[in-house]
């Protein structure tokens, strides 16, 4: 399953896994892993979509993970009942290509976010994800202005309820033609919106592909960053020696900036034991 498929199926029913339950793989009496506490660990549910959410939440809790993210409203209570947060929720059933960079999209997007912001606040969901949308021939300055026009209309409600709208930085090779594909562009948009309730979702995997210089850019733009995603490059798999980024150094740099938000694991496990891979990558990032 991909992010595109997950967003596109937001209105669908919960996945039911046939065969042997994952609970047998998780165990019933594992003590919770003690982590250092410098990083608030989260994980994207779509990467583990074949594991029933309740069982996945139990496994995450035992690993010391604090949040399962990129969930629809119907799933927020499930993770809350497991003692976890949902660090990032969805507000609209529109996917990545249709975003705030086109004025004709604003009516639906604003209505969807205005309706979801109070619900997110009530459920303790601190962030709602949004996207710029694809260029489709639009220049970057026009796209930025259009995004700012739409996002500014949401800021009074976001500020009232204490919910942050985060726009994800994506590479425009895998997500062909996506407009918010550079940190500098996203930061300039942040200045234009002018509210602490608009921030960027800095995806390390995507920005390594687009511009590299990950640590320096995190330091430079940290005031605009409200959430962080991981992923091995190339391939978006585990954060280990099979890929080019040295995640302990990146996490150390993030901690030194004073960043207090979540770091969400968004790699797609290549190993058969997905939960073991997740636990290993959490430990790699726990500096």
Identify the role of each PLM range.
Residues 47-49, 72-74, 92-94, 134-136, ...:
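Active-site-proximal loop/turn and secondary-structure-junction residues that shape catalytic pockets
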